A protein has these predicted regions:
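Active-site glycine-rich loops that stabilize anionic/oxyanionic intermediates
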Residues: 46-49
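Alpha/beta-hydrolase fold nucleophile elbow
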Residues: 107-118
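Alpha/beta-hydrolase-fold enzymes
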Residues: 117-147
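N-terminal cap/lid segment of alpha/beta-hydrolase-fold proteins
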Residues: 1-35
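Alpha/beta-hydrolase fold active-site loops
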Residues: 38-41, 111
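Alpha/beta-hydrolase active-site loop
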Residues: 86-105
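Conserved alpha/beta-hydrolase
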Residues: 53, 58-81
Length: 147
């Protein structure tokens, strides 16, 4: 997974895996500012994308004091699973909840904003139906929903 944009120097990058749906490894990563974050941007990527495609958000917001957390959905990026296929929509929202709980534990008093693009906007909107109180707000960019 590569990105056209390079990560700015001095940004703290962390990454890893957790056990996702049906035992598949789910890749996650975050970028942290030097000081305590003002807020967290929880980025949810779109179809056939991966979390590394959002370095423009990282490079803009992290130097301003915001943390950025994201994961690769099942079957996307570095996460395991059949490429771009899920058995049920909860295969997207389940790992999102698992990762959100980890982020909330590491940033207990910081507002968290969901940022979803395209299919990530749809996933984010569906997640918010059950977990609206998890987030201080949401930004849905071109969500894949019918209005």
């Amino acid at each position: 997974m590569t990105s056209i944009e390079a990560l700015k120097e001095g940004i703290n990058h962390q990454q890893g895996f957790f056990d996702g749906i049906r035992g598949a490894k789910t890749y996650h990563q975050c970028w942290l500012p030097k000081e305590e974050p003002k807020a967290v941007l929880f980025v949810v990527h779109g179809l056939a994308e991966h979390s590394g495609r959002y370095l423009h958000i990282v490079n803009y917001f992290v130097p301003l004091g915001y943390a950025v957390y994201t994961l690769d959905h099942f079957g996307h990026g570095r996460s395991e699973g059949t490429r771009n296929f899920v058995e049920q929509f909860e295969d997207y929202t389940g790992p999102l909840k698992t990762y959100f709980d980890t982020v909330r534990e590491s940033q207990p008093n910081i507002p968290i904003f969901l940022v979803g693009h395209s299919m990530g906007g749809l996933i984010g909107a569906r997640y918010l139906m059950d977990h609206q109180s998890d987030f201080a707000g949401a930004i849905l960019s071109g969500p894949a929903i019918r209005i």
